[in-house]
From Swiss-Prot:
It is an enzyme of class 6 (ligase). It comes from Mesorhizobium japonicum (strain LMG 29417 / CECT 9101 / MAFF 303099) (Mesorhizobium loti (strain MAFF 303099)). GO terms for biological process: 'de novo' IMP biosynthetic process; adenine biosynthetic process. Coiled coil: none annotated. This is Phosphoribosylformylglycinamidine cyclo-ligase. Residues 1-22 are annotated as: Disordered. One of its GO terms (molecular function) is phosphoribosylformylglycinamidine cyclo-ligase activity. It catalyses: 2-formamido-N(1)-(5-O-phospho-beta-D-ribosyl)acetamidine + ATP = 5-amino-1-(5-phospho-beta-D-ribosyl)imidazole + ADP + phosphate + H(+). GO terms for cellular component: cytosol. Pathway: Purine metabolism; IMP biosynthesis via de novo pathway; 5-amino-1-(5-phospho-D-ribosyl)imidazole from N(2)-formyl-N(1)-(5-phospho-D-ribosyl)glycinamide: step 2/2. It is found in: Cytoplasm. Belongs to the AIR synthase family. The keyword Flavoprotein does not apply.
Amino acid sequence: MSKRDTSQPKTGQPKTSKRRNGLTYAEAGVDIDAGNLMVEKIKPLVRATRRPGADGEIGGFGGLFDLKAAGFTDPVLVAANDGVGTKLKIAIDAGKHDTIGIDLVAMCVNDIVVQGAEPLFFLDYFATGKLDPDQGAAIVGGIAEGCRQAGCALIGGETAEMPGMYHGNDYDLAGFAVGAAERGQLLPTDDIVEGDVLLGLASSGLHSNGFSLVRRIVAASGLAWSDPAPFNDEATLAEALLEPTRIYVKSILKAIRNTHGIKALAHITGGGFPENIPRVLPKDFSAELDLEAIDVPPVFSWLAKTGGVAPEEMMRTFNCGVGMILAVASGQAAQVAAVLQEAGETVTPIGRIVPRRDAGVIYRGSIGL
């Protein structure tokens, strides 16, 4: 992992310079010692993400990755970057920072695996107005956990302490992931046909989209983040809403390699079904979804009823219980589903590919909100 630069504001003076009887960098709001302490705290977390191709230590100016050592012969690189959106605000307000990093990794690596690529390494950007080493270590701990779940190495990061740029305890995160696939093995394939089956993989909850609407609904409900969740007897409202985004990488890669039946994958993020599924389909085909086959988790029903959100708006904003959709050859759907279930996924047939009509997604039945 490359060395984290923990003091970002640039001045005409070296970072550690001090004029006689003058101000110091710490007095200006940037604590280099706090940054160094955070680096020490995260070193073991970073080491735990090592994998073939990445075994560097913290301290370099850049992270290294050896594609040959990772087993690739003629790879095509696939890159993705993303953030967590205003889900961060709930983590900040609730003081719960240990899982938001999982979301950051998930949003990037799930976008890589849908192209048939294996995520290889990850870098993060963490910006705050006042660095708290323990908080920072908790955040990076979540990032490291996400990397372990995805099988990718955390090889670099940036911690930016920027006084005056963020209010109070606010911070922001951005993630960058790079993966690879052998040339000729990228998805979607060019043989999608009418009758191909659509399989849905269950989400873990809201994942990381729609949280500006979520926060608006919670504010109108009068509930506090520490109150029991109305839709979950075992968690506070904050804990339930902060359930980390599911990382589908290992199960999907296993299904791709063991069945060769997956033709396309759609990560259901912002825009929901109508915006994400058509992105991976040829222009002469549509996805026909059987909405009554979808098992909608209680959190979505609560949001819809409490906020008075119409079903169409729910499906355009949230995943509604389906975090990933696969287009699979009809004759191999059972085999693909079996491999995914063995890998821990909840798999449901939710539709099929049909000739293109007016819309890229056609709904049948009603969703159970």
